[in-house]
């Protein structure tokens, strides 16, 4: 999620399975950006986050192989096929479902448009700062993520300049945003 580079997950899963390992894939960043084929890649567990595709915050999904004997995390009640007690968030579930339908049906079109915007952004940055380093530039990557370094330009100055040029950017990772380091 920092570089946008798409990892060779199918190869990783094949190696893990060869050694009898269970495989969990955090696909929060992938939904709506790359095709996820449960039949093609033999994940044991796959997790998704609704807020990454416009669904309400706090809703997600755990997709798991039904051959796995998964133990409930919270006992009581029959909710979520007996896997978790408590009232289900019906509005969140519905919102996630609707967002997933929308994003899955528009992934290819959206990715093509976003890729062209990404390429435009990179070209514009190169004209402003030819020394810019784009990490994973030649790799297979999602359309919406760029990791770059602007040598000799302080981060706060770069943020202000890019903001004035109508680009939405951040300095550092989302999980460290707003923290003093």
Residue locations for each model-derived region?
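Pyridoxal 5′-phosphate
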Residues: 1-181
